[in-house]
């Protein structure tokens, strides 16, 4: 048997004292961001565990829940898809919080950009990597995005203000600008340009529509709450960060 001998100056590793339940359907990569935001005193679990008391809860939902494929400044009152798995998960999460007397915080994040990202940003990145994703001539479509760091930060800051919030970086970036920024992050990968007719043939009607329709979301509700609590409403500009941030090994 090996005995551990503490040396002078050894600092024992802090043990988590609290538990966060984080439901992140389709965005499980957010767990590492949440762990970083909450700190070492918190343990993050992604589903209830028997015998484990939960001290706080958050659901990282998505603006994909809304029954809309095109529009500008869609707010939290926008109708949701009747058959959306996210709507079902939100209802189950709200019921869990009610039964366990926990504040119910649901963040409907726009397209999340960060390490391990999923959804449209990852599809764009993979398309760039294999040379299949190109600009579409004349495309001026805009979308909402948000950085994973801000989503995690707000999950901490809004624990005392439970509710449902849209989360964006507030910039409503163009698809072209996001493509260029992701390409820059990937060692300045070259991205060509296609005429709409060829792009429609290459990508298919659905993905072509995603790339060419504007769909942005209003986040004024969360900004009002932050202002009322004296907190900063500044968000990371996703495109700017991708273009200028000097990434190091410890970045998440």
Specify the residue positions occupied by each region the protein language model found.
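Amphipathic terminal alpha-helices
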Residues: 2-12, 18-20, 229-252
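N-terminal Rossmann NAD(P)H-binding glycine-rich loop of SDR-like oxidoreductase domains
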Residues: 14, 18-39
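Substrate-positioning beta->alpha
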Residues: 22, 117-123, 136-162
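Catalytic helix-loop patch of NAD(P)-dependent Rossmann-fold dehydrogenases
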Residues: 68-106, 111-112
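NAD(P)-dependent short-chain dehydrogenase/reductase
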Residues: 100-106, 110-143
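Conserved C-terminal active-site "lid" loop/helix of NAD(P)H-dependent oxidoreductases
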Residues: 148, 174-180, 200-230, 247-249
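Non-catalytic, hydrophobic alpha-helical segments
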Residues: 148-151, 167, 178, 222, ...
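Mid/C-terminal beta-alpha module of Rossmann-like enzyme folds, strongest
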Residues: 154-207, 251-252
């Amino acid at each position: 048997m090996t005995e551990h001998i503490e040396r002078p100056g050894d600092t024992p590793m802090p043990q988590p004292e609290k538990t966060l339940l984080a439901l992140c359907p389709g965005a499980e990569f957010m767990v590492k961001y949440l762990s970083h935001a909450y700190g070492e005193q918190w343990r993050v679990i992604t589903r209830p565990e028997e015998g484990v008391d939960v001290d706080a809860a958050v659901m990282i939902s998505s603006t994909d829940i809304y029954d809309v494929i095109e529009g500008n400044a869609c707010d939290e009152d926008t109708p949701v898809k009747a058959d959306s798995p996210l709507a079902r998960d939100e209802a189950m999460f709200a019921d869990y919080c009610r039964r366990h007397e926990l504040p119910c915080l649901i963040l409907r994040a726009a397209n999340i950009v960060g390490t391990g990202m999923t959804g449209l940003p990852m599809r764009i990145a993979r398309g760039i990597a294999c040379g299949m994703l190109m600009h579409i001539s004349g495309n001026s479509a805009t979308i909402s995005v948000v950085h994973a760091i801000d989503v995690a930060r707000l999950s901490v800051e809004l624990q005392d203000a439970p509710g449902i919030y849209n989360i964006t970086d507030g910039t409503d970036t163009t698809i072209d600008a996001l493509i260029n920024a992701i390409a820059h992050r990937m060692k300045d990968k070259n991205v060509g340009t296609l005429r709409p007719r060829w792009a429609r043939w290459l990508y298919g009607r659905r993905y072509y529509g995603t790339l060419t329709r504007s769909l942005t979301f209003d986040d004024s509700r969360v900004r009002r709450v932050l202002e009322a609590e004296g907190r900063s409403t500044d968000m990371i500009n996703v495109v700017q960060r991708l273009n200028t941030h000097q990434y190091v090994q410890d970045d998440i």
